[in-house]
């Protein structure tokens, strides 16, 4: 049998944390809890911002998109991850691995670009408040979202296709708990310099360029906030922007460390825990970060809870 086709016939073995079975049991519980928090928190943000007409603004339009993205991102990874952590079966089919890799890279790229667009939205709202709704009109917001998803899809197709075309010479064991690009590059039996440099180059475009734009936007925002005499306005701007900067720091920090190192020098276990952080923990914290100091979102969530309570009460009365 041609060894280069072995993986396509038999799939991949995901080692995960199989060297630490007790850790796997603990991690499976932790991951399941964070996944539940992600599902509940992000779904609540989407519903609350849709039901409250006061939140039908560009800022919350992008926040809904981020919440939807986090739901998709985690769902593309965590169910399979839990199967890997819980049971003895550590395999994933070749087709399953391909789908996971393409979707994972696509959605990860979308988040990088979406965070940059959200910073531009805050820049426009704070630095050009009189022109905010003219500049950030619904048509432009929709075009931005379509462009983000399209560019990210192209990035995913290029990187994943390059990686999957690398021959593995029969090696189908991935020292990871998901089909991640660095793990697949490591099992190749040929020189991977071209692929690694492609990842690095596209990483600069998809990761570093948006990050630079975010930092520039917040430089102007900080300047505008310091000029504002109203303490209440300063506090509101700092709360909103502080939430976004926290999310940016958590997400970009791990992504840069993982993908923008030529040769990917992160150790095996270090790489796994970093992946756990930005695929499991960060999406679950986003709803908390964005609502903790946001009075409008808190009020919208209270309305959603009252609406749910009333609808439940009506259903009970109808049944009785």
Swiss-Prot record:
GO cellular component, one term: plasma membrane
Ranges of the Extracellular topological domain: 1-25, 80-100, 159-195, 260-272
Domain of life of the source: Eukaryota
Outcome (variant: residue 81 to V): In allele 6M1-15*03
Keyword field: Cell membrane, Disulfide bond, G-protein coupled receptor, Glycoprotein, Membrane, Olfaction, Receptor, Sensory transduction, Transducer, Transmembrane, Transmembrane helix
Subcellular location: Cell membrane
Record-annotated disulphide pairs: 97-189
Transmembrane segments: 26-49, 58-79, 101-120, 140-158, 196-219, 237-259, 273-292
InterPro entries registered for this protein in UniProt: GPCR_Rhodpsn, GPCR_Rhodpsn_7TM, Olfact_rcpt
Glycosylated sites: 5
SUPFAM superfamilies recorded: Family A G protein-coupled receptor-like (SSF81321)
Gene Ontology annotations of biological process type: detection of chemical stimulus involved in sensory perception of smell
Cytoplasmic side: 50-57, 121-139, 220-236, 293-320
Gene3D superfamilies xref list: Rhodopsin 7-helix transmembrane proteins
Record membrane topology: Multi-pass membrane protein
GO molecular function, one term: olfactory receptor activity
Family annotation (PANTHER family): OLFACTORY RECEPTOR (PTHR26453)
Family from the record: Belongs to the G-protein coupled receptor 1 family.
Function: Odorant receptor.
Name of this chain's protein: Olfactory receptor 2W1
The organism of origin for this protein: Homo sapiens
Gene: OR2W1
């Amino acid at each position: 049998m041609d060894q280069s086709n072995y993986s396509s016939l038999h799939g991949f073995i995901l080692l995960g944390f199989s060297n630490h079975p007790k850790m796997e049991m603990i991690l499976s519980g932790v991951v399941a809890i964070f996944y539940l928090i992600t599902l509940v928190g992000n779904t609540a943000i989407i519903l609350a911002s849709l039901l409250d007409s006061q939140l039908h603004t560009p800022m919350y339009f992008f926040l809904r998109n981020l919440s939807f993205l986090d739901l998709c991102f985690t769902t593309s990874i965590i169910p399979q991850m839990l199967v890997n952590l819980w049971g003895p079966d550590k395999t994933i089919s070749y087709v399953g691995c391909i789908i996971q890799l393409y979707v994972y890279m696509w959605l990860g790229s979308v988040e990088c670009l979406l965070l940059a667009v959200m910073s531009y939205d805050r820049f426009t709202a704070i630095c050009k408040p009189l022109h905010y709704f003219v500049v950030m009109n619904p048509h432009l917001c929709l075009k931005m979202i379509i462009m983000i998803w399209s560019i990210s899809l192209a990035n995913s197709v290029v990187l994943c296709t390059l990686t999957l075309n690398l021959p593995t010479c029969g090696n189908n064991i991935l020292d990871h708990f998901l089909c991640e690009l660095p793990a697949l590059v490591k099992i190749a039996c040929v020189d991977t310099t071209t692929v690694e440099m492609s990842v690095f180059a596209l990483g600069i475009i998809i990761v570093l360029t948006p990050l630079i734009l975010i930092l520039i936007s917040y430089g102007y925002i900080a300047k505008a906030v310091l000029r504002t005499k109203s303490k209440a306005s300063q506090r509101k701007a700092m709360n909103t922007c502080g939430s976004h900067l926290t999310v940016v720091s958590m997400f970009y920090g791990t992504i840069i460390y993982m993908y923008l190192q030529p040769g990917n020098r992160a150790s095996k276990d270090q790489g796994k825990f970093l992946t756990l952080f930005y695929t499991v923990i960060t999406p679950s914290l986003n709803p908390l970060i964005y609502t903790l100091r946001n009075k409008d979102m808190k009020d919208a969530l209270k309305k959603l809870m009252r609406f749910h309570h009333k609808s439940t009460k009506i259903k009970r009365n109808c049944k009785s």
